[in-house]
Amino acid sequence: MKQRSLFSVLCFFFISFGVASVSAQTCTTDKGTFRPNGTYDVNRRLILSSLPSNVTDQDGLYYNGSIGQQPNRVYAIGMCIPGSTSEDCSDCIKKESEFFLKNCPNQTEAYSWPGEPTLCYVRYSNTSFSGSADLNPRNWLTNTGDLDSNLTEFTKIWEGLMGRMISAASTAKSTPSSSDNHYSADSAVLTPLLNIYALMQCTPDLSSGDCENCLRQSAIDYQSCCSQKRGGVVMRPSCFLRWDLYTYSNAFDNLTVASPPPEPPVTVPQPAGDQDNPTNNDSKGISAGVVVAITVPTVIAILILLVLGFVLFRRRKSYQRTKTESESDISTTDSLVYDFKTIEAATNKFSTSNKLGEGGFGAVYKGKLSNGTDVAVKRLSKKSGQGTREFRNEAVLVTKLQHRNLVRLLGFCLEREEQILIYEFVHNKSLDYFLFDPEKQSQLDWTRRYKIIGGIARGILYLHQDSRLKIIHRDLKASNILLDADMNPKIADFGLATIFGVEQTQGNTNRIAGTYAYMSPEYAMHGQYSMKSDIYSFGVLVLEIISGKKNSGVYQMDETSTAGNLVTYASRLWRNKSPLELVDPTFGRNYQSNEVTRCIHIALLCVQENPEDRPMLSTIILMLTSNTITLPVPRLPGFFPRSRQLKLVSEGSESDQYTSKSSSFSS
């Protein structure tokens, strides 16, 4: 009996180690593809990265949601079987979501039923599949071993178990081994030493009839292909079936298996010469020893081969994962996901006293994380259609951008229909808070303002040219420039930002969005935007920084001149050889006139009507940092009123007072 017990234990280990992983991911190839880095890709990353927290936040560990607008809307489902811990469930869904992001590079649909550390389900698609019974594409896996027991008896027991479980799962009745979300786990005695353990799950959105049909078809398919194997799995987009001869899941921990029938007496045949001595212990010992001598080395050898194979497989998988990560240009955002409860606690439940301000897309709150870090929490408005687009852009774009003159994104939250961005907290608020407040203007002397102009220029240059992506901000304005404790500028608010292709120079849109006072003429009137439209906005910003006045105001040189905005006012002053009248009076005489004049000159070059006439950012930075470059005469700015009352200086003439006369520079 001892030898038999040893043999049973070794068989158990053989079965356990011989089973393949049940996870088989399907990146559907016949449902279309999407453009990497495009809007669908952005939406897919957002919904998959937030799926673990969204699922575990639900009492039933089931989440069905979507993000975006057609044709780039992404639908997703995540779920775990009943009894799963939140930690195991989150881990399972996170691993599978990461797999899809790395290994389904442009497929618009994929699904998987991974089994570790618990059984979970992840699916995404560009079309709604809620309530739809999808039987294809189908996958199956089998145990490597064959059945040793009577196949006819096994089939009878297996079919009885399958029928009982399909009925329990599809009728959605809660029993000790099933729940009301189309799930069932059960077992049946096969032999005194072996039980059949089976687990079934349909997606909870299916009707009872569709669930039954899906599971029954899976059972039929398995019988057709693999009925002699010791275990197997059939996976479809809408249902899952697995059975095996060992407890592969904690779902079976509380199951009570019916007691096996009494074990029949075992008769050991004796050699013919010893028939008169039925109690010959030597002969009996030799037979058992032979069995053990043959069985143990064989099983150990198989185990060694399996372990070696497993180690080699893991090494190969690790290499492939490292290679995929190193080749991917898009950083995953999973590590940046915050749960809603954390953000709610950080902002004192979005208390009014924590509110820093409010814009067109939502409110901004000051928060403090549990580790003591101060953060700025941007809670997008649920009523704003633009808010959804803003969230998608900011959450993905800003994670790719690292520059001292760009605000840093710490994370985001996409739960309970909330869209929240968590930024580093910048202590001195935004530029407009100081620039347009008569009591605070004096805190920004010319030295600080000149430093701010240079920092903004370097930040835009990074967006346009120096980052891995070519990004047009499209909403540069004083309220989107934050100031840190040392008054260093940080560009923020990437809700309208657009990624350009390597060779792309211009984009077009029918949806004009942003702040009109900073818009270039070609964008405001025709929806055309490019790097040159950002440069126009930069020029407006420079004039505001120098003057302490808003471009949206109305200004005129004297009673006889036509009123205009700050840009036209600055252009008139320039052409009438009195640009320093633009300077903020709070400076007094504490500024260098040549430095200020040069900045006004550069700003007027940036706001020229023709985009081709505006300098590139690399040229602008050279103009700001070098006095040896001769600047061209600025042409008329955009929206300039052609008034006969205005006396213009000839386009071809230059004044020594307003242009540097050293070596020429061509942009």
From Swiss-Prot:
Residues 25-129, 135-248 form the Gnk2-homologous domain. The modification Phosphotyrosine is found at residues 423, 523. Residues 25-292 are extracellular. One of its GO terms (cellular component) is membrane. The active site is at residue 475. The modification Phosphoserine is found at residue 479. This is Cysteine-rich receptor-like protein kinase 11. It comes from Arabidopsis thaliana.
